[in-house]
């Protein structure tokens, strides 16, 4: 609608337009309806034409994960027949790939589990959650919301107990609403994407529609699907909730991917021919060093024994006997003095004694260093004598 029409529709005929410009930005709609002068119309005329011009719609390339159905499919009135919504539109080539009960022809296999239901004949059905997860949906609600050609069936108690006895659903589902869907309608909706190793047009139901939209014949419909080696069965349990189906839409990163980039690069690079033995020896020495440090720390702290709820220490680190000397009667003994010696023991390196070092070795050291060495030698000699007495 142009600005003149908007002015006639929104402005009374007896309204007097002021010649004074209004302050502020004009509204996004018609400028004539805003009560502006002719100068205002000329000022914003180019802007109005630029805003209202029609843009060309973008044409996107066909996606391998898109669902293709005839454009006029939903314009027909649907009727419920054999647990399916029948729109009265079929593809002659697609009918050759599946029969009326949902069984596939030509050696094709469904990616999800199929089964028959009690009281519904030999028609094939699927649990609604399994094709939903196979197509990338978190639950069946989104599946039926976005694909209107599918019909959800809620099984009754007798059908539910029959599925439990046949190990199709677990016993914990006895109090829950279980939904199923006809396998034939799933194939009509998703085509090659629901087929094991399905290829476009070759395994699609709406073959003519896929050709018209420019899909490549023979292309894999789902390149991300994990196909088994030749001769091995396809893993249909990956879409079953009680078999870890959450891994389908919650992929976990590998342990190698969680490592830093430098560690991944170092792990991938093979050791050089000239240094591989050195690298192994270096890693082994570091591992042995860690073990030694851990054992020394455990000896200082002790080993916790859960049955006695006590910390146990090695027997060879504890005293085994004591020696008492009785003082003579009538003699006065000086009050004993308590000397506290703080020793810092290294956790890794063993203790080194300097009692047997000759003076010629440290004769060139400063005087205060020589004095410290002599005091340490005297302490060690005194400690050795005390230990030899007991």
Curated annotation (Swiss-Prot):
The modification Phosphoserine is found at residues 36-37. One of its GO terms (molecular function) is chromatin DNA binding. The keyword Ubl conjugation does not apply. Pfam families: CRC_subunit. It comes from Schizosaccharomyces pombe (strain 972 / ATCC 24843). Keywords: Chromatin regulator, Nucleus, Phosphoprotein, Transcription, Transcription regulation. GO terms for cellular component: chromatin; nucleus; RSC-type complex. InterPro entries: CRC_Rsc7/Swp82 (IPR013933). Its main location: nucleus. This is Chromatin structure-remodeling complex subunit rsc7. One of its GO terms (biological process) is transcription initiation-coupled chromatin remodeling. It is found in: Nucleus. Residues 1-17 have a biased composition (Polar residues). Residues 57-70 have a biased composition (Low complexity). Residues 47-56 have a biased composition (Basic residues). Residues 1-72 are annotated as: Disordered. Belongs to the RSC7/SWP82 family. RSC7 subfamily. Signal peptide: none annotated. The gene is rsc7. Coiled coil: none annotated. Component of the RSC complex composed of at least arp9, arp42, rsc1, rsc4, rsc7, rsc9, rsc58, sfh1, snf21, ssr1, ssr2, ssr3 and ssr4. The complex probably interacts with histone and histone variant components of centromeric chromatin. It comes from the Eukaryota. Component of the chromatin structure remodeling complex (RSC), which is involved in transcription regulation and nucleosome positioning. Controls particularly membrane and organelle development genes.
